[in-house]
Amino acid sequence: MGNTNSLKYGNSVNYYEGVVVEDRGDIVTLDVKGRLGYLELTKDMFIAEYPFKLGQVVGWKMSFLEQLPGDAGDSYVRGVMNPDHTIYMESTVSLVEDCAISVDISDNQGFFKTPMRMLLSDVPFEVGQTVGWNMSKIVQLGPDADDKYVSNIHNRERRAIEISNRNN
């Protein structure tokens, strides 16, 4: 298993925001703002002061995903409940598409699907490769939902139903 020292660019940590799009009990799914992908994690990766709800905005710090030598370990280093503390994460590539990849986060903590522009690599990604990155806990930015985002979700669902009805 690698560690934070295995990363070439691990010290290049950026701030990201996302919106809660699904809460399935122990797992929360986020749409990363800026069309940067989907992130699904267990709730122990969140600092939550409020109940989760659709459209709620969250923020965190994260480095780019990088390829690592060797196989992903069975666990990763867990951080303290501090939004500024960086956690070293490790994962295995589970899906490679033309312009995106998905990674399954070790210890069944969730998955991350992201566009290729969020990745640092010297060689093409392949299923089974190990990747690593630094990430902080995810913090809720407030109790309220982003109404514009929730409205967009409902509009997208409504259009999908209309298209399905037309095709049937």
Predicted regions and their residues:
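Short, charged beta-turn/beta-strand-edge "cap" motif at the junction between a beta-strand
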Residues: 22-23, 61-68, 130-145
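Short nucleic-acid-contacting surface segments enriched for D/E, G, S/T with interspersed K/R
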Residues: 45-60, 118-134
